[in-house]
């Protein structure tokens, strides 16, 4: 295999495109967004933590971007990295996977490999990918190959993509071998599991584990706050135990595309088998509860100065769901911004990764990032720290903010000017 296609050039697809290019493949990046394709072909990065230099180096081996799905027929392997969101009712929304397969179907050819990397419920590959291929009169494992290999991308993380073990499940043994031959050229370790469903469930378990523990620690935080105890100090103390404890730190709520979404793919599928995933549903409830709790905390701190929300001036520090990246998908900061604005408050934000307010399917505001100075900080009744970006000047923030709600444990709380959130 010399030429591969990657469908979906976002936070997962772009790093993969770069990595395959670095390892001698000609990589074709498919995306319906023509602005992304244009930026790619100009060698311009559109994701903050990925340098343009990496894209330009990839182009030197002939890698490029396109929106023309007919080019599928020219590649040896197809890797699907499209979004898999949930509906308002927390049910799987697989429209992007279905659309990709419909568009690709006429251009599939004998000998190709398809790998689905998008996180989804167990059975998706067998229900949505394989039937489309078989409709083209291919035999899986003989003249066409299918695997599921979940993405494990951590935007802005310290561990390089190629150093993260690649999980892979094949529709047949021949499919698994074909998948290993592809991914083994890029990833240092490829772990073949016994079935596609095992691979699909592996990613769900990883994210369920984090979701449930974050739900637990945020509930713990809300109770500790009632007791007048600093949760951050409790977690730090517990983390000194060298066994049997993994530290999870509270925050303003779940964020990102994975944790607020993926666990509900599992709970939805569980109902098909007459089971209720109660821990997962409760963790989701805790995520909403902690956001509501933070709203109450804001009202409480404003009330200390006799200020109503409708006449308040509030600055939110950080729109990203995690530190040091330009990723605001499912960020609790966006929901909080909307709540303050909807209730008449004057709300602004500061985030070095978002000069302009990021538009999303749920929220869109015309706003730009506030430059942090002594003068700008003094204008606000309350500053709420939501994302622990390394580029924030924390001494400046502490010195010139009238009151701070800190959801990330940066400042020592004093219940006068600094409050835990």
Map each language-model feature to its residues:
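Structural/interface elements that position substrates and couple domains in central-metabolism enzymes
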Residues: 1-421
């Amino acid at each position: 295999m010399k030429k591969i296609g990657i469908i979906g050039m976002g936070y997962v697809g772009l790093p993969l495109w770069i990595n395959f290019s670095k390892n001698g493949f000609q990589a074709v990046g498919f995306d319906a967004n023509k602005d992304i394709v244009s930026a790619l072909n100009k060698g311009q990065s559109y994701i903050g933590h990925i340098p343009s230099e990496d894209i330009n180096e990839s182009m030197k081996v002939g890698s490029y971007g396109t929106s023309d799905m007919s080019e599928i027929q020219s590649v040896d392997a197809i890797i699907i990295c499209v979004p898999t969101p949930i509906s308002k009712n927390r049910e799987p929304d697989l429209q992007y996977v279905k659309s990709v397969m419909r568009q690709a179907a006429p251009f599939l050819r004998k000998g190709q490999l398809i790998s689905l990397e998008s996180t989804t419920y167990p059975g998706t590959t067998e229900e949505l990918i394989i039937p489309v291929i078989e409709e083209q009169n291919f035999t899986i494992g003989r003249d066409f190959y299918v695997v599921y290999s979940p993405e494990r991308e951590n935007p802005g993380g310290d561990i390089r993509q190629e150093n993260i073990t690649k999980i892979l499940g094949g529709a047949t043994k021949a499919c698994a071998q074909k998948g290993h031959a592809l991914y083994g050229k890029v990833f240092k370790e490829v772990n073949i599991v016994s079935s596609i469903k095992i691979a699909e469930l592996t990613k769900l378990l990883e994210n369920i584990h984090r979701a449930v523990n974050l739900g637990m620690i945020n509930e713990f935080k809300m109770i500790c706050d009632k007791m007048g105890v600093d949760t951050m100090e409790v977690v730090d103390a517990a983390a000194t135990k060298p066994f049997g404890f993994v530290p999870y730190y509270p925050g303003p709520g779940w964020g990102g595309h994975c944790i607020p979404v993926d666990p509900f793919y599992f709970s939805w599928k569980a109902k098909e088998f007459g089971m209720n995933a109660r821990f997962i549903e409760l963790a989701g409830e805790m995520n909403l509860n902690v956001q509501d709790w933070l709203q109450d905390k804001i009202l409480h701190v404003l009330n200390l100065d006799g200020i109503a929300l409708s006449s308040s001036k509030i600055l939110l520090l950080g729109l990203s769901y995690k530190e040091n990246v330009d990723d605001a998908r499912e960020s609790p900061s966006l929901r909080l911004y909307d709540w303050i604005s909807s209730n008449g408050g004057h709300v602004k934000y500061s985030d070095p990764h978002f000069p302009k307010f990021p538009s999303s399917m749920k929220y869109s505001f015309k706003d730009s990032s506030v430059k942090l100075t002594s003068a700008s900080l003094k204008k606000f009744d309350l500053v709420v720290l939501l994302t622990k970006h390394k580029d924030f000047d924390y001494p400046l923030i502490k010195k010139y903010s009238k009151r701070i709600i800190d959801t990330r444990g940066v400042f020592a709380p004093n219940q006068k000017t600094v409050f835990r959130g």
